[in-house]
């Protein structure tokens, strides 16, 4: 019996692959972008589904597939994407390259973003009272696919025809390495340690390989006695709770006996600070910088919703992957907030130039102190990784801030971005914007 045959476009269990996926044991199944598959069921947390293709049966990541009649199957449909992320995705410079996106702030509201002669134009897709869709009122369509097809043959109100769908962004993160894998605790022998990537406050970070899955990973180790074991385990516990495309994903821990390990996904290009300092500025231009900042604010909005504070947000604690993907890392100081503020215990070391005044003065932390740090991080991005408060001694920073001194607008930084920095640097925490507003 051919389960994939027949006119079953409306079959709710028929899906199509959005990306290639290569099986890595544990009954996983390789799929190719565009291939049809039938979903038979999901694992305990819904992150993997059992599927059947013409090549066999096995497990695939749920976020790599989409129902066969959904919009996601179209190469031009990018789902919820912000305006400046759309401009980044269309930065290749080809006339007629385009994408269709859903508004992040108003779900259901869609737009076409279209590049022509060095500019990106945005057109709202309207819905008429009879449910038909249009950009220009004279041409109305039953479906989005029909509308896109029409405007690919005639401009009809657009600056040019829709010609080249913009490539989709990176493949999504596979949460968890296999469908059966719910044990965070790993054997140290599962990991081959390679070279050292850097040192953190509490220990070293290494590149390693998870042998079973031939997967490159980052391994954070705990220096003996530098940090309470309890604190290290708290960091791992925080990371287990967190799943967002712009937050570094925890894969496992080794906590039975020292040396302790936290194992996370590996990010190819290392920390954002070094990346900004060494990058080619022609390639990492204003559009890319804004796209990076948007990804960080998206991650922070998620932490805000979850009542987490990061407490050490800075370019050195963000990591860079392929295609300018940025993820916030280093939850070493982060805390789940039960009240609105958290008081750090005496003797905690703070990175002074990123720390909000109320945290420096009273050890008080809240999501609004993360907003202050985000303002400093924006300044780091705008200056390609300069050290904040250039020429100012650490001991003078608080006093100057108290007297209303704030860093000046970096050269080439758009006025609107600088206004956002200044809003993040309001003395009174309640006057600072929330990440939900920033993003």
UniProtKB/Swiss-Prot annotation:
The keyword Nucleotide-binding applies. It comes from the Viruses. Belongs to the protein kinase superfamily. Tyr protein kinase family. ABL subfamily. The active site is at 312 (proton acceptor). InterPro entries: ABL_SH2, Kinase-like_dom_sf, Non-receptor_tyrosine_kinases, Prot_kinase_dom, Protein_kinase_ATP_BS, Ser-Thr/Tyr_kinase_cat_dom, SH2, SH2_dom_sf. It comes from Feline sarcoma virus (strain Hardy-Zuckerman 2). This is Tyrosine-protein kinase transforming protein Abl. Keywords: ATP-binding, Kinase, Nucleotide-binding, Oncogene, SH2 domain, SH3 domain, Transferase, Tyrosine-protein kinase. PANTHER family: TYROSINE-PROTEIN KINASE. Residues 76-166 form the SH2 domain. It is an enzyme of class 2 (transferase). The keyword Membrane does not apply. GO terms for molecular function: ATP binding; non-membrane spanning protein tyrosine kinase activity. Its EC number is 2.7.10.2.
